[in-house]
Amino acid sequence: MNEQPSSYIFPFLWLHGEDEATLRKYVRVIHDSCLNAFCVESRPHPAFVGPQWWHDMDIILEEARSLGMQLWILDDSHFPTGYAAGAMVNAPAELCRQSLVCQAIDCPASGEWLELSLADYAKAQPAQLSMMEQYTLDADHLRTWDDDQLISLVAVKEHGTGEQDLVDLNEALGQETLRFQVPEGKWKLHILHLTRNRGPHRDYINMMSAASCRRLIDAVYEPHWAHYQSYFGSTIAGFFSDEPELGNGHLYESGKAIWQMEDHAWSAGVTKALREAFGAEWSKYLPLLWEQPFDSDLCARVRLTYMDAVTHLVEQNFSEQVGDWCRAHGVKYIGHVIEDNNQHSRTGSSLGHYFRALGGQDMAGIDDIGGQVLPQGEWNGPWSVSGEVR
């Protein structure tokens, strides 16, 4: 308002490998618009954290410093944050994303025997791409793994009223055949696998794994420190994460309740948390992440325990680890997750818990690019910016 440069608003400066004169002009135009800061948008650049990137950043930083400006750095080469500049493309399996999937089979009538060849269920069912994924993903080049694990066999009674209506059949694991005499009532056999062959971004970090998230720091943050240590905390204000995700489910689907998800985000930390919560038979409760209808109190307990584990792991291993690194190096950490349609409280394209997802950041934020937040409050109409019912 007084024509003095401000840092309250800072635009994104999209970089495509422009020449030096253009880069200097862009920085000056931002400054002359009474804006004292900007965020370097790395994703369209042809050589992020490569020689041309450092060449272009040298120019931008020199110009920004001469004008007394600050800049933030968007922290990845692909959208969303988590690609780690390609560091996960050939990463060991244990660092990659993993999902829990469930296949349910109707049991025969009460008193009859269910016999199942477990060799037919050694692997999870193949993933089915959504229409959006068929158009936007190169399905022939999606990374695939052969380390599927059959982890649990559980019989679940329809309209069950408690733990007595969950039958742990894991003693059959490792055997050729499962034999189960069906008790009174209507039952389903739930076959649960861990698989890495799910999700649209299989070459992204696992947000629940400290070692996996460290790949992002090593690939992006550390090289910037190595090149520009003298700018940290002065011209370089910090780093920006854009819409990091857990990545299970389908590409940018929204509005699904937990029991409607085709797969659930997983890590070794989730296994540990559920074992601590439910004991040695923890895996017999896994069908209740999906099963409808069943005792609502027990379903709620299982789902809350799962989501609590997932989101605490995200906070600790991703958000706080990155934020702690930034503060230890004299800069700040900011960004946002997908919030539309309450997605901030879900997995898939977001991180399951708004405050834990941003717990390591110095300033929390939201995306307001489609008019979904207005001066009088949130838009209460029936549609989101993507045309989906809210």
Question: Where are the predicted features?
Answer:
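Catalytic domains of carbohydrate-active enzymes, especially glycoside hydrolases
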Residues: 21-43, 59-63, 70-72, 325, ...
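Acidic/glycine-enriched edge-of-secondary-structure segments
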Residues: 9-16, 205-209, 365-373
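Hydrophobic targeting/anchoring helices
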Residues: 44, 80-84, 91, 317, ...
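Hydrophobic alpha-helical scaffolding
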Residues: 47-50, 203-210, 214, 308-312, ...
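Conserved short loop/turn motifs at secondary-structure junctions
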Residues: 41-54, 307-312, 339-343, 371
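Hydrophobic faces of well-ordered beta-strands that scaffold small-molecule active sites
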Residues: 9-13, 38-40, 71-74, 237, ...
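Active-site beta-loop-alpha junctions enriched in small/polar residues
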Residues: 16-18, 43-45, 76-78, 241-246, ...
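Mature extracytoplasmic enzyme cores
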Residues: 1-2, 8, 22-32, 50-304, ...
